[in-house]
């Protein structure tokens, strides 16, 4: 059994003037440890996004990567400094799914398309007889792997912001495709 640990992070920048967004961009990243040794990193960025979407996308990308690299019985731990993301997949999504992907107050779920895509990947991981765990880590602290993911996400965000284009950096070029295509 191989142990995969992904440290994920997302970042976004928005410039507002007179209450209107003039320009925005975001970045995401993951750092992968296999059996507690750094194995690889992956990051990307795109215009017109939010911080929460990028946090979720980092999780999506890490799960896609895990499904490509893992074998039956492997273990994966997703480490994120986003309480929003951790709570979605450890507390809220189970009830949302039971209620037809609706919140108990009837309000729409933000980022639902991406959440459902991650939910589908979670099912694929389980069907592969792999164990999946989510872990909340403290952001901007002494955790070198979370700090590295934060730095990579910030760099990708800045490049996407300056260029206005989708960018991708990683060992598996084409793994994730264009932002507009990343979720079915």
Where in this protein do the model-derived segments appear?
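RNase H-like nuclease fold core
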Residues: 1-53, 57, 64-67, 150-151, ...
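RNase H catalytic domain
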Residues: 11-18, 63-148, 180-183
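Short, surface-exposed, polar/charged, turn-prone segments marking secondary-structure boundaries
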Residues: 33-36, 59-60, 104-108, 115-116, ...
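Charged, low-complexity intrinsically disordered terminal regions and linker tails
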Residues: 35, 126-127, 169-170
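Charge-dense, low-complexity polyampholytic segments
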Residues: 73-84, 162-176
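Flexible domain-boundary/linker segments
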Residues: 75-76, 95, 151, 158, ...
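Short, surface-exposed, charged/polar-biased interaction segments
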Residues: 99, 106, 155-158, 170-174
